[in-house]
Structure formats: structure tokens, C-alpha cells
């Protein structure tokens, strides 16, 4: 920064976008291999490459922001705009799944028996595990807000406690979702109901895992005193993302579990 006449961060060449793209290719190809040929080798390779990329990319960004001072107010403003645009793109991503669901359910075709849920499908009870999942995510939304307020007030211990509670609730949600999938009386191959249900709730579950990972990184960074009350965009971005995941779940619960059943 000492040799620059501007406040912007000129990023050094990095291999991580390339390895990240490679891991995405390996994971999507691996999913196809798993679905059609029952082989998980390519999927595991993709997941390993993805984990290594995440670790090293996060390490570089933490070095640049916390230790080298590259994240000036101007850079943070750009990162905020970037995160907002990313969340908007995610909203549009999930809109596609809701569109598919309502397109199929509002005017069910004769092939589905002219009714929704389709003939032969026994939907999950929305007042059992899905309602528990809803309360778990709403509670995690409260605890992440508590963590944010504690950080703003400089209360490190409360911030760590609240962040730990949020992570625990996120992991609990994932375990509940996995058990629900395991016990579901229908599969992803059971027509349009199975495919829209598992793709929409599955991608949301993936986002919960990503959000939990993001919060775990923030937890370890807070243990190392990386965040201050006026310089903590990494945590702020994780909190925004978590609230987004919360809101998407409410729409999923009302649409697919409650109305759709």
C-alpha cells in the first residue's frame, strides 16, 4: 500500500479461480457418475479439490485484508456491492425452482392424475420435522444477529458464544434434513414432485452447509482476534448470507411443505 497513489486493491495473479472451476467441473461430473454408475471416485476428487481451493483462497484473502491492510474502505465498499449482487443472483437461482414447482402444481397434467401431490405420492407432514427445521433456522437467525450486535459493541465472548450457537443450529438443521431425506417415502426419480422437492430443498441444504462453513471460518478468525467493531466485513457477509438462507427456507416451507402437501 505504501507505493500506491489510490485506495484500490490490485489483486496479485491467483491460481484459485482456475482450481475452483476445475473442482466445480469434477463435482458436477462426479454427481452424474454417482447417479448413473454408482461411482463416487470423481465426486470425492472434486470435493477434495474444492476444499483445498477454499482453504487456500480464504488464507490468501485473510492475509491481504487482516495482515497487509489491502481492504481499505473503498475496497470494502466494492466487496459489499459484490456480496449484494451475489445474493441477488442466488434469489434468481431459487426463483427458477419455485417457478418449476408452481408451474407443475397449479395446473397438474392428466399424467399426474390431475391433482397435486400427484397420485401415489405421500408428502411429508409439514408439522413434524419441517416445522422443527423452521424453528431451528429462525433461532439461528436470532443468534447470528446477537453475534453481530456483540461484535459491534466489542463484546468478544458473547460474539463467540452466539456464533457457536448459530453453527451448532446449522449443523443440527443439516442432520435433520439428512434424516428426513433418508426416511422420505418418495425419491428424486418419482416424477415432477420428487424432482422439484429434492432439487429445491437439496440446493437449500447445500447453501446451509456453505453458510455453516463460512461461519466456522469466522469463528476461528474471531478466536485469533481478526475482527474489530469497525472492520469485520468477512463476518458481515456471512451474516447476510445466513439471513438469505433463512428467508429462502421460509418460502420453501410455506410453498413446498405446507401448501404443496
Swiss-Prot record:
GO terms for molecular function: cytochrome-c oxidase activity. Keywords: Membrane, Mitochondrion, Mitochondrion inner membrane, Translocase, Transmembrane, Transmembrane helix. The keyword Isomerase does not apply. One of its GO terms (biological process) is mitochondrial electron transport, cytochrome c to oxygen. Residues 35-40, 106-128, 184-190, 257-261 are mitochondrial intermembrane. It comes from the Eukaryota. It is a multi-pass membrane protein. CDD domains: Cyt_c_Oxidase_III (cd01665). Coiled coil: none annotated. Pfam families: COX3 (PF00510). The chain crosses the membrane at residues 16-34, 41-66, 73-105, 129-152, 156-183, 191-223, 233-256. Residues 1-15, 67-72, 153-155, 224-232 are mitochondrial matrix. One of its GO terms (cellular component) is respiratory chain complex IV. Its EC number is 7.1.1.9. It catalyses: 4 Fe(II)-[cytochrome c] + O2 + 8 H(+)(in) = 4 Fe(III)-[cytochrome c] + 2 H2O + 4 H(+)(out). Its main location: mitochondrion. Belongs to the cytochrome c oxidase subunit 3 family. Component of the cytochrome c oxidase, the last enzyme in the mitochondrial electron transport chain which drives oxidative phosphorylation. The respiratory chain contains 3 multisubunit complexes succinate dehydrogenase (complex II, CII), ubiquinol-cytochrome c oxidoreductase (cytochrome b-c1 complex, complex III, CIII) and cytochrome c oxidase (complex IV, CIV), that cooperate to transfer electrons derived from NADH and succinate to molecular oxygen, creating an electrochemical gradient over the inner membrane that drives transmembrane transport and the ATP synthase. Component of the cytochrome c oxidase (complex IV, CIV), a multisubunit enzyme composed of 14 subunits. The complex is composed of a catalytic core of 3 subunits MT-CO1, MT-CO2 and MT-CO3, encoded in the mitochondrial DNA, and 11 supernumerary subunits COX4I, COX5A, COX5B, COX6A, COX6B, COX6C, COX7A, COX7B, COX7C, COX8 and NDUFA4, which are encoded in the nuclear genome. This is Cytochrome c oxidase subunit 3. The gene is MT-CO3.
Amino acid at each position: 500500500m505504501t507505493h500506491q497513489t489510490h485506495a484500490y486493491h490490485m489483486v496479485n495473479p491467483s491460481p484459485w479461480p482456475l482450481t475452483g472451476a476445475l473442482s466445480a467441473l469434477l463435482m458436477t461430473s462426479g454427481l452424474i457418475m454417482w447417479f448413473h454408475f454408482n461411482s463416487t471416485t470423481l465426486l470425492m476428487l472434486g470435493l477434495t479439490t474444492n476444499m483445498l481451493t477454499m482453504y487456500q483462497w480464504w488464507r490468501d484473502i485473510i492475509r491481504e485484508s487482516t495482515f497487509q491492510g489491502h481492504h481499505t474502505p473503498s475496497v470494502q465498499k466494492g466487496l459489499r456491492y459484490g456480496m449484494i449482487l451475489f445474493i441477488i443472483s442466488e434469489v434468481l437461482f431459487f426463483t427458477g425452482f419455485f417457478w418449476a414447482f408452481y408451474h407443475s402444481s397449479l395446473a397438474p397434467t392428466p399424467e399426474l392424475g390431475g391433482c397435486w401431490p400427484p397420485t401415489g405420492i405421500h408428502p411429508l407432514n409439514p408439522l413434524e420435522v419441517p416445522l422443527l427445521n423452521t424453528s431451528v433456522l429462525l433461532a439461528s437467525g436470532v443468534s447470528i444477529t446477537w453475534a453481530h450486535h456483540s461484535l459491534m459493541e466489542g463484546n468478544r465472548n458473547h460474539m463467540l458464544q452466539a456464533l457457536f450457537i448459530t453453527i451448532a443450529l446449522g449443523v443440527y438443521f443439516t442432520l435433520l434434513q439428512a434424516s428426513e431425506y433418508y426416511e422420505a417415502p418418495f425419491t428424486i426419480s418419482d416424477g415432477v414432485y420428487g424432482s422439484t422437492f429434492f432439487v429445491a430443498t437439496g440446493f437449500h441444504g447445500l447453501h446451509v452447509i456453505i453458510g455453516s462453513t463460512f461461519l466456522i471460518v469466522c469463528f476461528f478468525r474471531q478466536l485469533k482476534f481478526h475482527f474489530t467493531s469497525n472492520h469485520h466485513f468477512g463476518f458481515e457477509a456471512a451474516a447476510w448470507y445466513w439471513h438469505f438462507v433463512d428467508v429462502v427456507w421460509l418460502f420453501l416451507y410455506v410453498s413446498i411443505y405446507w401448501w404443496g402437501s
